[in-house]
Amino acid sequence: MSSRKQARLEAKQFIDTLSVQPYPNSTKVYIEGSRPDIRVPMREISLADSLIGGTKEAPIFEPNEPVRVYDTSGVYTDPDYAIDLYSGLPKLREGWIEERNDTEILEDVSSVYAKERLDDETLDDLRYGNLPRIRRAKAGKCVTQLHYARKGIVTPEMEYIALRENMGRAQYRDDVLTQQHPGQSFGANLPKDITAEFVRKEVAEGRAIIPSNINHPESEPMIIGRNFLVKVNANIGNSSVTSSIEEEVEKLVWATRWGGDTVMDLSTGRNIHETREWILRNSPVPIGTVPMYQALEKVNGIAENLNWEVMRDTLIEQAEQGVDYFTIHAGLLLRYVPMTAKRVTGIVSRGGSIIAKWCLAHHQESFLYTHFREICEICAKYDVALSLGDGLRPGSVADANDEAQFAELRTLGELTKIAWEYDVQVIIEGPGHIPMHMIKENMDQQLEHCHEAPFYTLGPLTTDIAPGYDHITSGIGAAMIGWYGCAMLCYVTPKEHLGLPNKEDVKTGMITYKLAAHAADLAKGHPGAQVRDNALSKARFEFRWEDQFNLALDPDTARAFHDETLPQESGKVAHFCSMCGPKFCSMKISQEVREYAKDTEQVAADQAISIKMLDDPLEGMRKKSEEFRATGSELYHPAVHAEADE
């Protein structure tokens, strides 16, 4: 059997047999809001008690508070839910959408292409079987979260997000957990407690977005903005040479398990429409796409044959399926294309290269630019956010921060203002390949020219010499730009520049980028960001190995690495690991120092350790050496009361 067929069979088995898979020693908890249908999921990690004294026969323990962490995994980790990927997820937001009374149910799909797919009986075996009713804004109505926010309306989505962003940190009473270094926020506004009103205000002013298509009620509300937790996007999608619907659904579930805040379906192969339907109906997180990819497939891959009619039909098709945000490369203008001529790597954006080719072939501005207002009108009817694409992002560090890149960025700022006229939510996409010392300029330029709309970057990669390790080269840049104010990071997997990522590549990319995002939250001083670090550090010092594993971003790998060298159960309680062994563990020695100091705390400091200063330093050293050997060459021993100085 070929490896491709084997991968597809394994993915289908995954879909058919998927069951709830909770995290180790974790419980799915729900925080209730002001109404019973606002239930915000979090993962609560239970911790072992700390040994604080007593004897071997009668030890004294102190309980450790459980730690709550942000949870993107949806019902896939809820033991009370019976998973059925063929039926889809619960429609969490459907009631909220209905009670606003500004949408209508359509009798049929509006897209010509979608109708053709539905009428094609040969697709019956591929098609998702439980298609939902399609909604659209009523005539004269706008249904975006930005519209509601500007009207002063605090939606259930906004209250949900406020509870989610606070991560239940008000429950903590242990000062060890709540201590935190002040951060450097570079002008970000990070309130101690996030309220629903704060969420509304940030959305109203364009500094944050809530991706929430009315046709994707399964998604759990989340926010992307500089003044909130840094988010991470995972890319999935088939290509013309590899992957299947089953594999992409498997990647979706896998990506959200490991922390994907949003997922982009970048499929360019067969059955894009059907693949996307399966993904949307089973996604607890917002889904983004690049509609241009599917539009290109509709004209047989010939960029010059693209036109507004094909693109418009594609936008409506995807909006009615439930896509939460579109990447639109509308800022790439004809006059910017010659600016890339002297680049080392030219135009590396897939969407950017398509638009550039179209502009040159027709020698006019792209239909995305000339029809941008119509794009906004479509988005406003379904609450699809716009992710304004950086088609001229640098593809090598040699091309970083050049004229073409920043010219397009300024145009994206102009388009942002147009989108806001229609109450359409906007984020701005960024690079790319940028060396470390040039990263901050990207954030500064974006804030200046794009009116503080959220920034969303691919990395950036800080060097070009590490194919196979670009999750690391980009993770460095991602942590930095997240610290400077970037709102969402698009993950990079080890397969970047090499091939389509598989399931394990998705996990590696996600863990790397959750690490980068968390490091940025710590550096910004996001309230409560340090709680998990503090809990893990305390567990590490107390040799609570299971707690260390369970608090880790990747408990499975942490446990596996430990067990490679200390597989016995006794290794889970040992006061050392295989790195240093029992005699050289700094934390074990440090604990002994702490116990020694505790035992002698009633003795004056100048008596606790007898170090007598002598007139002859060398003689003093010799005597202390003899004294050390005479007492058994032990690093620590009971204090000896020193004689009074003569």
Curated annotation (Swiss-Prot):
Assigned protein family: Belongs to the ThiC family.
GO biological process, one term: thiamine biosynthetic process
EC number from the UniProt entry: 4.1.99.17
Residues the record lists as binding substrate: N235, M264, Y293, H329, S349, R350, G351, D390, G391, L392, R393, E429, Y456
Function: Catalyzes the synthesis of the hydroxymethylpyrimidine phosphate (HMP-P) moiety of thiamine from aminoimidazole ribotide (AIR) in a radical S-adenosyl-L-methionine (SAM)-dependent reaction.
InterPro entries: ThiC, ThiC-associated_dom, ThiC/Bza_core_dom, ThiC/BzaA/B
Annotated [4Fe-4S] cluster binding sites: C577, C580, C585
Disulfide cross-links: none
Domain of life from the UniProt record: Bacteria
Cofactor: [4Fe-4S] cluster
Catalytically driven reaction(s): 5-amino-1-(5-phospho-beta-D-ribosyl)imidazole + S-adenosyl-L-methionine = 4-amino-2-methyl-5-(phosphooxymethyl)pyrimidine + CO + 5'-deoxyadenosine + formate + L-methionine + 3 H(+)
Known partners and oligomeric status: Homodimer.
Region (Disordered): 624-646
Regions that span the bilayer: none
Keywords: 4Fe-4S, Iron, Iron-sulfur, Lyase, Metal-binding, S-adenosyl-L-methionine, Thiamine biosynthesis, Zinc
Cofactor note: Binds 1 [4Fe-4S] cluster per subunit. The cluster is coordinated with 3 cysteines and an exchangeable S-adenosyl-L-methionine.
Name of this protein: Phosphomethylpyrimidine synthase
Residues given in the record as Zn(2+) binding sites: H433, H497
Pfam families xrefs: ThiC-associated (PF13667), ThiC_Rad_SAM (PF01964)
Native species: Vibrio parahaemolyticus serotype O3:K6 (strain RIMD 2210633)
